[in-house]
């Protein structure tokens, strides 16, 4: 992948695969939609502090996932319970996973339990990476196209990005840091992967 200018994304890979990639790659790697594991203990889809530090050492970027289950341990537990309940109900009703009734039942449980994280949890995720490795290795991964009805309050779609920027300003992030987080860090990693390659 390095040899053809293809960026390597470690979101969704196992820990073993992650460490293999870090050993082999000679270009910046990214986690396109992951958050710090320390915020959601036991949720291995997120990144350990060691992984975050190793991505930074490649000059890569950790693009923060906004999903409630990715940034808040209580939300993670509730959504796990909801998914388990929905699957049990689906089997009992002999329905397919993509049947409309299944989604309606899931929405009923979500509306009842209100398991959503808050935008502050996303800002905490950004703070954690910042405190660990600095502002050169953070970006927004959102995962708007993959999360469905699990996004935090005040961060439901791209029109609410301004809330995130305002949150960063309130937490005393500089204009330069915010620009890095919004786009400059990702562009740097992208361009480093494309260096010496024609597209």
Where on the chain are the PLM-derived regions?
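Active-site environment of divalent metal-dependent phosphoester hydrolases
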Residues: 13-19, 36-39, 69-72, 146-148
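Conserved, mostly hydrophobic/aromatic
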Residues: 8, 31-33, 62, 143, ...
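Acidic, His- and aromatic-enriched active-site or binding-groove loops in soluble protein domains
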Residues: 28-38
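Aromatic-lined glycan-binding groove of carbohydrate-active enzymes
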Residues: 48-104
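Mid-to-C-terminal alpha-helical segments outside catalytic/metal-binding sites
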Residues: 156-199
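Short acidic/histidine-rich active-site segments
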Residues: 64-69, 133-155
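Histidine/acidic residue-rich metal-binding segments in metalloenzymes
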Residues: 1-30, 44-60, 121-136
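C-terminal helical cap
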Residues: 101-127, 176-190
């Amino acid at each position: 992948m390095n040899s053809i200018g293809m960026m390597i994304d470690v979101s969704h890979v196992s820990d073993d695969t992650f460490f293999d990639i870090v050993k082999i790659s000679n270009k910046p790697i990214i986690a396109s939609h992951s958050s710090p594991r320390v915020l959601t203990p036991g949720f291995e889809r997120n990144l350990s502090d060691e992984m975050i530090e190793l991505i930074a050492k490649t000059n890569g970027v950790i693009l923060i996932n906004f999903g409630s289950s990715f940034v808040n341990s209580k939300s993670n537990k509730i959504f796990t319970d909801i998914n388990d309940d929905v699957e049990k109900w689906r089997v009992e009703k002999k329905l397919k996973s993509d049947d409309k009734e299944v989604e309606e039942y899931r929405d009923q449980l979500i509306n009842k339990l209100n398991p959503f994280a808050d935008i502050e949890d996303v800002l905490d995720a950004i703070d954690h990476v910042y405190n660990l490795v600095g502002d050169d290795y953070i970006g927004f991964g959102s995962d708007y196209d993959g999360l469905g009805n699990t996004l935090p309050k005040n961060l439901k779609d791209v029109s609410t990005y301004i809330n995130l920027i305002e949150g960063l300003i309130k937490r005393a992030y500089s204009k330069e840091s915010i620009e890095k987080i919004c786009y400059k860090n990702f562009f740097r990693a992208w361009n480093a992967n494309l260096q010496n390659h024609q597209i």
